[in-house]
Amino acid sequence: MPEPLVTVQSVSVTLGGNAVLSDVSLSLAPGRITTLIGPNGAGKSTLARLVLGLVQPDSNHGTVIRRKGLRVGYMPQHIKIDDSLPLTVDRFLWLAAPGPTASRRAALERAGVAHLRRRGVQQLSGGEMQRVLLARALLRKPDLLVLDEPAQGVDVAGQNALYGLLKTVRDELGCAILLISHDLHLVMAATDEVICLQRHVCCSGSPESVSRDPAYHELFGPGAGTPNLALYTHDHDHDHDLHGNATHSHDHNGPCNHD
């Protein structure tokens, strides 16, 4: 396995007198998608901020090791933009990373929304804004991409399309991806490793092994591991656009299996 980009070793974090994380460890390696799952208040966002260097561990309670020169892209759960600002998508990206137009166009193309470059950000749908935020995170060609609830507000087909796109980004850039989610419907089938968090690591491993772990069922309920919930898969011979609609990029000489 490649050398980790970030290693968190036995870290505890206390914020405002409250223990938010306790003895947590994880390793993020290039080319792998890791997903943090857990209920609200489990410490998922705090752990992500720890990885990003925005939160420090408690004194004498673990270490965080980051590879020197690590480039990080971050996609927040929410972003507030003043409705009165006449802000185009291109300008929005420029404010995050000033540079040549070609780099912004390339990031939007990789996120599947190059056609939105001159659109006003206030005119974007929820799914379109998620793709633009992803393009923003990709501008620096990151070694590590951190996404906080990237599919929130997107329907199931759109989520599947987004996770498929993230796999493509991972393959093209060779980056590590850290996903944060509380939605079990699709995310576990779109990841290499799952870490189940409830202020500490309850269980971790492949999606299949975690879905069978008693600690996982204790946290999410006895039905959480059923195929139509945690281990949803979508085998098809078509692609999806950012709204989740099927697009036919394959050869129609044979039968189609559109769902």
UniProtKB/Swiss-Prot annotation:
It is a peripheral membrane protein. Gene3D superfamilies: P-loop containing nucleotide triphosphate hydrolases. Residues 233-259 have a biased composition (Basic and acidic residues). It is found in: Cell inner membrane. Residues 230-259 are annotated as: Disordered. InterPro entries: AAA+_ATPase, ABC_transporter-like_ATP-bd, ABC_transporter-like_CS, Metal_Ion_Import_ABC, P-loop_NTPase. It comes from the Bacteria. One of its GO terms (biological process) is response to zinc ion. Residues 6-223 form the ABC transporter domain. Belongs to the ABC transporter superfamily. Zinc importer (TC 3.A.1.15.5) family. This is Zinc import ATP-binding protein ZnuC. It comes from Alcanivorax borkumensis (strain ATCC 700651 / DSM 11573 / NCIMB 13689 / SK2).
